[in-house]
């Protein structure tokens, strides 16, 4: 059975993130290992939301998987909530990259030409660097504009 890591948030309402990715990937017959980046009450397009940062947990999850000898066929990212998390995700790529697998980055950071609440140009620049490590990137038009430094 194929096995994939998905690294993204859990949005409690909003038809996105791990609440959508996990059942879809599992329904395809792929074992899905999750690394939650944050727990949000709603996604960031809502006017009010809570954000529980899980940055501190991410390295220890990786360390346990290394000790257990887990191997993965792909790594797929979604919403990454902080600059520090981008560095941690990059470390996941280095640790678990399968030469016959894929790294897939959804640079979830913008819509309608604007960065999500809490993100700035430094975040967009660092996300662009992370995208350069991917085999496949899945930006929307706003994210593509930021990644390529093209006007929206």
Mark where each language-model region is:
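Conserved beta-alpha-beta core of the PfkB/ribokinase-like small-molecule kinase fold
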Residues: 77, 83-152
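Small-residue (G/A/S/T)-rich helix-start motifs and N-terminal tracts that mark the onset
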Residues: 1-74
